[in-house]
Amino acid sequence: MSNAHDIKPLNDNIGLEEAAQGFAAIGSEPRLDVLLALVRAGHKGLTVGEIQQKTGIPASTLSHHLRFLSAARLIEQTKDGRTIHNQAAFTHIEALANFLLRECC
């Protein structure tokens, strides 16, 4: 886990490998559901419990999906005591969308 201050903004020119990793992460309906919940929450983000309430995904499975999304840099996680806050990584999500528009349209 990292602090939000440690995360470097992504260049809009992401490569094929990074784009494939991002698209693979949202290729799962539950992970897409989690990401959409975080996008809707805005920069405030959600705790793991709040995500669980909004998506209905069991805690053990949710943990797996959050790790996958974090590894793909689609979400950022910060720890505050025993609470983990999750936020959509809007800069990276935008870079991923721009990659698709640039390469495919």
Please give the residue ranges for each predicted region.
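Amphipathic alpha-helical dimerization/coiled-coil segments
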Residues: M1-G22, L36-R40, F90-C105
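N-terminal helix-turn-helix DNA-binding core of bacterial DNA-binding proteins
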Residues: E17-T61, D80-H92
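Short, hydrophobic-biased segments on the C-terminal half of alpha helices
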Residues: L66-R67
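Glycine-centered, phosphate/nucleic-acid-interacting loop/turn motifs that mediate DNA/RNA or nucleotide
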Residues: R73
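Short beta-strand "wing" residues that participate in macromolecule-binding interfaces
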Residues: Q77
